[in-house]
């Protein structure tokens, strides 16, 4: 049975602003268990900071750098009804590890979900998609 983006996507995408420090972005990624953070400006999504971008910046005064200094300006997006196999091809062709799913209503510039290589591997293994866990309640 063919799977679609909506079947394997992880709902929720961490975001930051252009001036967010790389140290703060690293904290967001760690807290959200995310491979990337979408950079937002006043119109919508304008870039992506990936784990690779952070690691590449680590030796070069990363504590002085912000999202705009290291982000990839291209945010690849797909619709929820795209075939998972087509998305896998796109990711390989574009040399990216994730693509983002935009809100289904027109004019929304903020991604609502993400498809990662990990999600595709989980699908290949016959595992359920990763879903965000509710926060633990402290007693």
Residue ranges and their predicted role:
Residues 29-32, 37-52, 91, 99-119:
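A glycine-centered beta-loop-beta connector
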Residues 2-10, 14-24, 28, 32, ...:
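The feature marks the first
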Residues 1-12, 50-96, 110-139:
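Tandem CBS (Bateman) regulatory domains
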